[in-house]
Every structure is written in structure tokens, then in C-alpha cells.
Swiss-Prot record:
Gene Ontology MF terms in the entry: magnesium ion binding; RNA binding; RNA-DNA hybrid ribonuclease activity
GO biological process: DNA replication, removal of RNA primer; mismatch repair
NCBIfam families per record: rnhC
Gene3D superfamilies: Ribonuclease H-like superfamily/Ribonuclease H, TATA-Binding Protein
Domain RNase H type-2: 95-311
Cofactor, how bound (note): Manganese or magnesium. Binds 1 divalent metal ion per monomer in the absence of substrate. May bind a second metal ion after substrate binding.
Co-factor requirement: Mn(2+); Mg(2+)
Top-level EC class as recorded in UniProt: hydrolase
Reaction equations catalysed: Endonucleolytic cleavage to 5'-phosphomonoester
GO CC terms, sorted: cytoplasm; ribonuclease H2 complex
Protein's UniProt name: Ribonuclease HIII
The protein's Enzyme Commission number: 3.1.26.4
Chain positions recorded as a divalent metal cation binding sites: D101, E102, D206
Length: 311
């Protein structure tokens, strides 16, 4: 017998829900209904009375996304970074999920890479066997070994924002948060198109900003993924799809970084510490300041520090 959960909410939330489920709307609406939507393992029906019914195996998980919105009092409340209606259901770790993660945002040298990966629930034991976990806990050699196997196991989409383009977009008023949002959305969109007609049970983004801010960044985009999209900090510990995305993003970043070092004709350090300032100063001396945008993220404080070292 399938689960059935009813929540009481308001017209604003129902309109938001209709927007979220717009790609899953059913042409049929029951009497007194506003809309009916069908997502994997759950049917959602919203009524003019303000009641919303969730039916199916994932009724509880789907309803939990909206209960906090409906029950929050109008007085301002301070929410934790993970407290929002896009929080993943408790069972997400065993679901078939698209996960996305980015690498390179804190490195002065090198590009920003974003990868989206689809992991079918049946593949989870295999990924564990391959040693898939957060890339921050793996060295470059381990990343390479695991990534080379992953490339043949999971569907993925990989994007690289090279330094020159990064600096150009940043100069046009796009902060790093917006650039990350654009890349995550694009990688996920590309992967979903590649996977079609297979649909994941959900999409999990390794959270780098509040979901509402994420969607504001995407306001002018033609294609924005909203259906069953969840956000969680430390996403790699929530689902292996994010951990796999983290590894492939790191693998891509390391490859690009090595190519950049060859182009520079000198080893380039990662991160944004003092050794980076010294290396940047040497690079300016070697190639000239006009070549710097090819290698670095110019808005970092390291740029000014490198020029100071040359005085």
C-alpha cells in the first residue's frame, strides 16, 4: 500500500510548487484542484483549499521539502545553512541520483571545473569498491587512478572555465557564486540530455550558497533545472554521486593545472598562499604582466601581492 501525506499550506507556496513541478504536470486536475504532478514514486495534488496531497513510495520525502515552508511562522527566524525546502530526503543515499561538485574556486592559478555525475542505486556498491569518497581526502595519484575507472562506469558531464574566460566574465559583474551556479546548472542540464530518456530520482548539488540565491543567479537562463533538485553542504557524504563528481572535477582540474604549468615553463603551486604570490611574481617577470590573465584569477588578493614583490 502506497503512502499518503497531506499538508496544509498557502497560495504562495502552492504557486512555487507548481513552478517547481512544471515539467511533471499532469493534464488532468481533480475537482477543486489547482494542479497534479507526477514525479518518480510520487504524485502531488494541490487543492484550492490549500491542502496538498502526496501519494506514493516517496510521499514522505517529497512532502518534507514543503512542510518547513508551510509551517514557518511569518516572524523572521535565523536558519542554518542546511535548513531550507531543498534539503534532501533521509533516504537519498540509496537513490539513483545526479550529483554535482566544483573544484578550483580557491586556487589562484588554474581554472574552475564543474562535473555532474549520474549514479544508479545499483552502482553504489561498485563505487564504494573503487574507493570513491570526497576528493579532498585523496592525493592526485589516487584521484587519477579512481577517475580513470569512473570515466568508464558512470555517465557524466564535465565543464572547464579557463582563466581568461573566468576573468572576462568576472569583469562583467559575475561574482564567483554566480559563475559556479551557471556551471552547475549547465553540467546538470547537459548530463540529463545525455541520459534521456532515463531520469534520475533527484539531483544533489554540493551546496555553496543558499538555494534561493542559486536560483536568483540563474534568473536569465533559458534552461534551469528545478525538478527534484536538492542542496546539501558536504554533499559527498550525502550521496556517492557528489563524491564521484568531486573526483572527476579534481581529475580534470589536475590535468588542466599540469598543462598550465607546462605553458608557464615552471611549476605552479595550488592554493592561494604565500608560495603562490612568489610564483606569480616569477611568472610576471618571465612572461610579462599582460600574460597573467591566462594563468590566474585576477580578482584574488594574490595579484596585488605578486606585483608588490616585484617593487
Amino acid at each position: 500500500m502506497s503512502n499518503s501525506i497531506v499538508i496544509q499550506t498557502n497560495s504562495t507556496v502552492i504557486e512555487d510548487m507548481k513552478q517547481q513541478y512544471k515539467h511533471s504536470l499532469s493534464p488532468k486536475t481533480p475537482q477543486g484542484g489547482i494542479f497534479m504532478a507526477k514525479v518518480p514514486s510520487c504524485t502531488i495534488t494541490a487543492y484550492k483549499s490549500g491542502k496538498v496531497m502526496f501519494q506514493g513510495g516517496r510521499a514522505e520525502a517529497e512532502a518534507s521539502r514543503w512542510q518547513t515552508v508551510s509551517q514557518t511562522p511569518k516572524t523572521a527566524v535565523k536558519r542554518s545553512v542546511d535548513s531550507h525546502r531543498y534539503a534532501p530526503p533521509a533516504s537519498i543515499g540509496t537513490m539513483s541520483i545526479v550529483g554535482s561538485d566544483e573544484v578550483g574556486t580557491g586556487d589562484f592559478f588554474g581554472p574552475m571545473t564543474v562535473v555532474a555525475v549520474y549514479v544508479d542505486a545499483k552502482q553504489i556498491p561498485l563505487l564504494k569498491e573503487l574507493g570513491v569518497k570526497d576528493s579532498k581526502n585523496l592525493n592526485d595519484e589516487q584521484i587519477t587512478a579512481i577517475a580513470k575507472q569512473l570515466l568508464h562506469v558512470v555517465p557524466y558531464s564535465s565543464l572547464v572555465l579557463h582563466n581568461e574566460k573566468y576573468n572576462e566574465l568576472f569583469d562583467k559583474g559575475n561574482n564567483q557564486g554566480k559563475l559556479k551556479a551557471l556551471l552547475h546548472n549547465k553540467a546538470i542540464t547537459n548530463l540529463l540530455a545525455k541520459m534521456a530518456p532515463i531520469k534520475p530520482e533527484g539531483v544533489l548539488i554540493d551546496q555553496f550558497t543558499q538555494p534561493d540565491t542559486y536560483y536568483k543567479y540563474l534568473a536569465k537562463q533559458k534552461q534551469v533545472q528545478r525538478e527534484n533538485v536538492y542542496f546539501a553542504t558536504k554533499g559527498e557524504s550525502v550521496h556517492l554521486a557528489v563524491a564521484a563528481a568531486s573526483i572527476l572535477a579534481r581529475y580534470s582540474f589536475v590535468k588542466q593545472f599540469n598543462e598550465l604549468s607546462k605553458k608557464a615553463g615552471m611549476p605552479l603551486p595550488k592554493g592561494a598562499g604565500k608560495q603562490v604570490d612568489i610564483a606569480a611574481a616569477k611568472l610576471i617577470q618571465k612572461l610579462g604582466k599582460e600574460r597573467l590573465p591566462e594563468f590566474v584569477k585576477l580578482h584574488f588578493a594574490n595579484t596585488e601581492k605578486a606585483f608588490r614583490l616585484l617593487k
